[in-house]
Amino acid sequence: MSKMAEQKAAAVDGLGGAGAADAAPAGEAAAARVRPVETLLRAAPLGLCVAAMTVMLRDQQSNEYGTVAYSDLGGFKYLVYANGLCAAYSLVSAFYTAVPRPATVSRSWVVFLLDQVFTYLILAAGAAAAELLYLAYNGDKEVTWSEACGVFGSFCRQARTSVAITFGTVLCFILLSLISSYRLFSAYEAPPSSALGSKGVEIAAYPR
């Protein structure tokens, strides 16, 4: 009986090893199929960032009441800087993704963290600029700020276009963050039942 049990265990181990060997090429093939799609997704924010930055840089209006430009408002300047940084990151990350390389947990962590940083960066820039636009259109009676878009309508419309494009960039970066987070955390196995402590506390599993 013991010999039969040992033979069965050896057979199971052999099947497991073969399955693991087959899984590696399958995983590499799947990554090769997904790579062009992810490369395009990472390149898409580049055009949006450049468009939003260009529209805002050209935003200026002069009339009998005076002259106003994007550089007069800190929130709009932050929007320009954030779009410039995100455009550079989009270009670099697209090239990085396009080049085939073995996936490692450390690389997945780097991409995940950078995606998070730039997602929050562009989100904060869009939110700050949107708040400025709200005040420009509606004013603030609490501090006796009057609305300005009735006087500088062209300036406000151009700024609104730039902010709208920026929020399109935000959606792209959110999608990229979801992809990189899935790739990272799918590299970790769920803890087996034996990893539960006596008090039902789970012990973190090691990466594959």
Curated annotation (Swiss-Prot):
Decide whether keyword Magnesium is in the record.
no
Segments spanning the bilayer are 37-57, 79-99, 109-129, 162-182
Q: Topological domains (Extracellular): residue ranges? A: 58-78, 130-161
Topology: which residues are Cytoplasmic? 1-36, 100-108, 183-208
Question: Could you tell me the keywords of this UniProt record?
Answer: Cell membrane, Membrane, Transmembrane, Transmembrane helix
Q: Pfam family of this protein, just one?
A: CASP_dom
Give the main location.
Answer: membrane
Q: Which GO terms describe its cellular component?
A: plasma membrane
Location within or outside the cell? Cell membrane
Record note on quaternary structure: Homodimer and heterodimers.
Q: Give the family, as the similarity comment puts it.
A: Belongs to the Casparian strip membrane proteins (CASP) family.
Q: What is this protein called?
A: CASP-like protein 2A1
Tell me the organism.
Answer: Sorghum bicolor
- Give the organism's phylogenetic lineage: Eukaryota, Viridiplantae, Streptophyta, Embryophyta, Tracheophyta
